[in-house]
Regions:
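PRPP-associated nucleotide enzymes
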Residues: 1-109
Length: 109
């Protein structure tokens, strides 16, 4: 992994992420396939980017007995940078359906 990354930046080098990126960049990928691969890529990104999220214990009732599991310790906000980041939201929400979604707008000359 490159050592010159800024603090807080994670470079995901998982083979499945690399494959999905290759498929996204391929000129032969049509719009339907592009959206499907982007959804898959964002799901993989969520798994990697949430690796160190704090959790807290929570007790639930199973059909047989109480069970102590884990829940997120704090609320999570997904904030895609408009407009390109919007395509990543669906895959993220598939794993984190209760998060808040904010939006960041940026432009360039």
């Amino acid at each position: 992994m490159p050592e010159n990354l800024p603090p807080g930046v994670t470079l995901i080098q998982h083979p499945l992420v690399q494959i999905k990126l290759t498929q996204l960049r391929d000129v032969k990928t049509d719009s339907r396939e592009f959206r499907a691969r982007l959804n898959e890529l964002s799901t993989l990104m969520v798994i990697e980017s949430t690796r160190d999220l704090a959790t807290r214990p929570v007790v639930i009732q199973t059909p047989l007995a109480p069970y102590e599991g884990r829940a997120l310790a704090r609320p999570v906000i997904v904030a895609p940078i408009l407009r390109a980041g919007l395509g990543l939201v669906e895959g993220m929400l598939s794993l984190l359906p209760d998060v808040s979604v904010a939006h960041i707008g940026m432009f360039r000359n």
